[in-house]
Amino acid sequence: MSDLTVDPQHPWPGLASFTEETRAYFHGREDEVNELARRVQRKLLTILFGQSGLGKTSILRAGIVPRLRREGLCPVYVRIDYAPESPSPSEQIKQAILRATASSGRWTKPGTAVEGESLWEFLHHRDDVLMDDAGNAVTPLLIF
């Protein structure tokens, strides 16, 4: 479905999800987007669940993520690969954070993940702050 075009003549992505790039065509879910964005900002853990095909991914990618990005959060999409040859889930999360934040700003003390450190250590030992181009602090937001 990667060749599907969403534009004014074709404003619906079919079975694909809306994305940040196609958010201009995503309408009618403003109440849900507002409520979920408030929950994400208030709670350390927010779980969005429901039956397949209800539009959870579209709400996240075309509704909540663009709004939270404007409000100083950096979305980090994480898909854990459980194949035997894959890095540990903790390592995959650390790498996803480094990839996502590389395009969203800069760390005050750039670094990389240290071999063998836990995810908690990675997130807390750095004494580091992610800044946007305007010098505002940006908070990574993990989305699984």
List each language-model region with its residue ranges.
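Amphipathic helix/helix-loop-helix segment enriched in hydrophobic residues with interspersed Lys/Arg
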Residues: 1-144
